[in-house]
A protein has these predicted regions:
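Hydrophobic faces of transmembrane alpha-helices in multi-pass small-molecule transporters and flippases
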Residues: 1-8, 46-49, 64-95, 99-100, ...
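Small-residue-rich hydrophobic transmembrane alpha-helices
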Residues: 2-3, 110-175, 207-229
Length: 292
């Protein structure tokens, strides 16, 4: 709970510094960057101070600062693929943006604003994925594969329900959300924004599946396969964007994200099933049935 309070404080401080540095100080983009860095630094100091004062079990002792080769190897084996995965995902976003840019400033503005709303309604999926990582890691670590599978099934059930709710909210609140970003008449932008949103919300279930399966595998210590899922996502988005630009179709451009989500979801689902089956075979080999 305390870390959430620090996060809320950091967000509020970020807004306050934005107003002070951009509006009051006239610093523009530099002020926005400085506000973000300062607010995150304050949050990090508060979290570190809380750990040091209130949770001594998490505070490294005098002999615990020396890195151990095995620990470093394990952390890098998971951390590097995760970093590459985020880089690949960001590259896919650049591909999508390049395709949208060809349709003019109205399309770009509408796509950007609708994308903000899309990101907002996706937050529940992201949170569920983070919870699945911890859940799967704990149960996979103690060899309870049945609980891992039950958790994944429950996570996918929640994902389907949430995806439907997010789709309804995304389409219902699109115009009010657009009004927050733009003053005056937004009628010219709405067709672009609504086309993008109406296509994306149909594929929220594959998007939610990505967060479930990717985080489960990462929680179980598998870093390469989630990264490979990011590559599948990038390739699907790239192929769709190329065809969209050649055909000059904004509708096809809006399918870049859904195509990427679907490709990644299928790849990650298949990878998860293979990992679970392999783990079950290894467990049966280690624990042969008792003889009667």
């Amino acid at each position: 709970m305390r870390e959430k309070l620090h996060l809320v404080f950091s967000a509020c401080l970020n807004v306050a510094l934005d107003l002070a540095l951009i509006v009051g100080g006239g610093m523009g983009v530099e002020g926005a960057a400085l506000a973000t860095v300062l607010s995150q630094a304050v949050s990090a100091v508060l979290c570190g101070g809380y750990i040091f004062l209130k949770t001594p079990d998490l505070t490294p002792g005098a002999g615990q600062w020396r890195p151990h080769r095995g620990d470093v190897r394990r952390e890098l084996s998971i951390g590097i693929p995760m970093a590459l995965q985020f880089a690949i995902t960001a590259s896919g976003g650049m591909v999508m943006q390049s395709a949208v840019n060809r349709f003019g400033s109205l399309a770009v503005a509408a796509y950007t604003a609708a994308g903000k709303l899309e990101t907002l309604v996706e937050q529940g999926m992201i949170a569920l994925g983070q919870a699945m990582a911890s859940y799967a890691g704990q149960n996979f670590g103690k060899g309870d594969l049945d609980r891992v599978k039950k958790g994944v099934r429950a996570g996918m059930t929640v994902t389907v329900v949430y995806a439907v709710m997010a789709a309804v909210l995304g389409t219902a609140f699109l115009r009010p959300a657009m009004s927050l970003f733009f003053a005056g008449d937004i009628s010219a932008m709405m067709p672009w924004a609504r086309t993008y949103m109406n296509i994306c919300v149909v594929f929220f279930i594959p998007l939610g599946a990505i967060f479930v399966y990717r985080n489960v595998m990462q929680g179980c210590g598998y870093g390469f396969l989630p990264m490979a899922g990011g590559i599948a996502e990038l390739l699907a988005r790239l192929v769709t964007a190329v065809f969209a630009m050649k055909m000059g179709s904004y509708v096809l451009t809006c399918f870049c994200h859904p195509a990427a989500w679907t490709a990644a979801a299928v790849f990650l689902w298949v990878s998860y099933e293979r990992i679970i089956r392999k783990a079950e075979r290894e467990k049966r080999a280690e624990d042969p049935p008792a003889a009667f």
